[in-house]
């Protein structure tokens, strides 16, 4: 590229980036939670809910979130609580998935599952919604007149602690729930099925000495220059598809789906198998999995997988189209996807994605149910992508330095089961957990509304 043309390209990228960041600063008041204004949710004429300070619902680290969740569940007398250990940190503290089961009339009203933290850092939003729901005046107190309610808190505790989406093995847990033999799937999956390798120089640039990730020039300008020719050749949707489809051949890359089932998901699948009374034998099941990142700022998009194996015995007799208008729109959601091929702009590019957790359970469930991901928007998609690329570069460089130092992140005692887990992503917190009073309030209101709508639907559609 001629030097004059290169200079023009650089200037355009710099100006564009500056304008974009200036535009989106209005969404980020950068107020770390100390005291938020009260918020009110009017669900219907009889049910109005309020929270004096949403900051009390949010946490800044995993251990704080876990402590708040456990304290909230202890306020109830008849609740079954337990934890699945996933890892142990250097201070001998367990990093766990915490489970709370609020018993209900399962044979008549079914089961509702609410999960947070599958993507680690995104769990701070899900945890806040769960705490808001656990206030005494929100959940129906009569066990005979409600479904069984299950909260799964921090499905990816290591990612939540490290402020990353991936887990302790750099695996994206929402690409890891593969049906059948995973080894066969990995061996037969084309590594470039979604053009991941075509975008490699942007998604996973060669940076052997950590020069690029430490360069302000690369982080603000250079990476865009790296990307522009690829965007010109393939387009933005192709870039998004290359990222979100997941890949199974590069353990150091982004959206890595792994080559074996990860401990977190093994715990959840075992829980499913061991409690048929709550899952397999339940006449209906609604599963809400909370995510952040895609879509309009502070608003929720719904990606759902209806399970209607036998319409004649369906718990939810509505067609997917009727559910779309009667169920999801009343939950304040702005976009939704019924199945592959019928997708909103938020979920464009996911047609090749495999291993999604809600999709997995929708397929193994043998009755009628609704399995959905509720996604709260933060930044524009390409800025989310920027954060993911930079975080992975820094994380891999950090791990490489630890390896060269000879400790590999293992504690001084040499116990391979106890890891440091001291990495904290400086990029993904802002991308997936923006410090904004507006965003915090919107997430709580919309997250609670969807859960209440699910409860309402379950009790109105009993057999």
PLM features: what roles do these ranges have?
Residues 2-463:
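Structured catalytic-domain cores with a bias toward divalent-metal coordination
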């Amino acid at each position: 590229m001629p030097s004059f043309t290169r200079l023009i390209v650089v200037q355009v990228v710099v100006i564009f980036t500056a304008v974009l960041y200036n535009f989106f600063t209005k969404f980020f008041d950068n107020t770390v939670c100390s005291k938020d204004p009260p918020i009110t949710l009017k669900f219907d004429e009889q049910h109005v809910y309020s929270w004096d300070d949403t900051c009390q619902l949010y946490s800044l680290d995993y251990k704080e979130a876990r402590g708040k969740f456990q304290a909230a569940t202890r306020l109830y007398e008849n609740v079954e609580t337990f934890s699945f250990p996933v890892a142990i940190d250097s201070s001998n503290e367990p990093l766990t998935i915490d489970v709370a089961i609020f018993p209900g009339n399962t044979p008549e009203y079914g089961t509702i599952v609410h999960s947070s933290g599958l993507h680690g850092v995104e769990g701070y939003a899900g945890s806040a919604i769960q705490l808001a729901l656990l206030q005494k005046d929100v959940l129906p107190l009569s066990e005979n007149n409600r479904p069984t309610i299950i909260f799964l808190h921090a499905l990816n505790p290591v990612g939540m602690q490290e402020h990353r989406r991936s887990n302790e093995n750099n695996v994206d847990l929402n690409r890891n729930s593969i049906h059948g033999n995973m080894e066969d799937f990995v061996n037969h999956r084309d590594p470039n099925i979604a053009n991941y390798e075509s975008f490699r120089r942007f998604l996973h640039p060669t940076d052997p000495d950590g020069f690029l990730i430490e360069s302000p020039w690369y982080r603000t300008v250079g990476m865009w220059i790296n990307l522009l020719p690829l965007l010109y050749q393939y387009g933005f949707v192709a870039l998004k598809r290359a990222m979100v489809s997941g890949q199974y051949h590069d353990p150091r890359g982004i959206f890595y789906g792994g080559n074996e089932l990860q401990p977190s998901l093994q715990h959840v699948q075992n829980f499913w198998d061991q409690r048929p009374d709550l899952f397999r034998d339940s006449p209906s099941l609604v599963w809400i999995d909370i995510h952040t990142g895609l879509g309009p700022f502070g608003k929720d998009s719904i990606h759902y997988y209806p399970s209607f194996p036998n319409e004649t015995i369906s718990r939810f007799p509505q067609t997917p189209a009727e559910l779309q208008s009667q169920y999801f729109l009343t939950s304040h959601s702005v976009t939704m996807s019924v199945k592959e091929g019928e997708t909103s702009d938020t979920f464009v590019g996911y047609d090749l994605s495999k291993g999604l957790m809600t999709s997995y359970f929708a397929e193994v469930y043998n009755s009628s149910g609704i399995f959905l991901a509720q996604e709260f928007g933060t930044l524009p998609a390409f800025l989310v992508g920027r954060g993911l690329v930079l975080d992975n570069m820094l994380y891999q460089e950090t791990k490489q330095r630890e390896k060269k130092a000879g400790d590999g992140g293992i504690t001084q005692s040499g116990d391979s089961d106890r890891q440091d887990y001291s990495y904290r992503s400086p990029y993904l917190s802002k991308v997936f957990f923006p410090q904004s009073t507006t965003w915090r309030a919107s997430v709580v209101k919309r997250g609670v509304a969807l859960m209440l709508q699910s409860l309402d639907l379950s009790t109105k559609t009993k057999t």
